[in-house]
């Protein structure tokens, strides 16, 4: 599993066109599973590491409920059970918020510093299960010194 995540993080960096690929190394930091039930949510937050100011996070959706329940707040812009990313430039030609209704198998990789959160859902006793991994991006010279 570790090799799969590391490969995804490396591909993300390549697609971003960053030169960090040559000068830095990916170090997988920690992994965890989240089980969330109706009414539970994950407030907006970002990730950090004691080892690096630069890193990547990921979330893989392993299980999702059959329904996220009736949309009460604003049916035109649903949010029940959605994953939301917040960031980017704040002007009219930029998307500063991205919200998605995740399905089993959806996999997202994003920078540590990207603010994100998960909305609560209702109408079911089924679980939403995710697997997340954090990855530090450390200078190769720092790793050799250890």
What are these regions (language model features)?
Residues 1-54:
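Signature of the catalytic double-stranded beta-helix
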């Amino acid at each position: 599993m570790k090799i799969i995540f590391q490969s995804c993080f490396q591909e993300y960096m390549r697609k971003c066109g960053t030169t960090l690929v040559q000068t830095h190394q990916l170090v997988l930091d920690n992994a965890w599973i989240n089980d969330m039930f109706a009414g539970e949510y994950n407030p907006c937050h970002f990730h950090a590491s004691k080892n690096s100011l630069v890193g990547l996070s990921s979330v893989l959706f392993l299980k999702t409920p059959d329904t996220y329940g009736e949309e009460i707040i604003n049916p035109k812009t649903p949010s029940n059970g959605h994953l939301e990313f917040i960031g980017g430039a704040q002007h009219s030609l930029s998307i500063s918020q991205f919200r998605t209704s995740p399905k089993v198998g959806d996999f997202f990789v994003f920078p540590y510093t990207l603010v994100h959160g998960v909305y609560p859902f209702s109408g079911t006793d089924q679980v939403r299960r995710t697997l997340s991994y954090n990855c530090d991006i450390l200078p190769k010279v720092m790793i050799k010194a250890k």
